[in-house]
Amino acid sequence: MKKIFLVLCLMVSLPLFGQYKVDTTITNEAYTAYVNKELGQALYVKYKLYKGGGKCQRATNWVNDTKLTLVNENQYKGTLYDKGHLANAEDFAYNCHLDSLTFRDYNRLPQTRKLNRGIWKVSENEIRKMSQTDSLMIYTGGHWGSPNTVVNGIKIPSVCWKVVYSLSLKKVVICTIFYNTDIPVKTETNLGSLELMLGYSLNVFVDNKKKKK
């Protein structure tokens, strides 16, 4: 009961109104990115993961292969924020082309170094391990509180989040919020509460109704 109360209190501290909405969708061979053009960033991405991992050498150059004006590489320079992957590069390391597609400007959000290299990375590794025995749909993105923190013209998400849907169990098995702070913490929640905070539906059950392992 205390944990539920804590989650609700944390969510109440994040505004529910005036949130950014998806206005552009970008799909490549690896994932789909749901972008807001005002932000110049993805609100979230979605991809299927089964037996993730491999030996491909990690790419290093980020690319904008669209005509959209997106947050660019130069804006990150001199900041204390990492370029945090949404669709994780290592998840696609079994195919070097797919791996390279994760280095797109619409597949990252600014994350504190301690988040990106800490509990976020741990979560990525745990999900990839799960994918060795189950086919998963991954939804991962950010949420911007008010007032926005803005660094070099980049609006910084207050939180990042992950939802994992098991295609074999036909249910959400992970729904986690990560606070994008210098001392990052995570909290487990449920899909309904997350969508209430975001102000839009992820259509998890609609998307996966006809999918099979």
Cite the ranges covered by each PLM segment:
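Domain-level detector of nuclease and nuclease-like folds
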Residues: 66-213
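Cleaved targeting-peptide boundary
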Residues: 17-25
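Sec-dependent N-terminal signal peptides
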Residues: 4-16
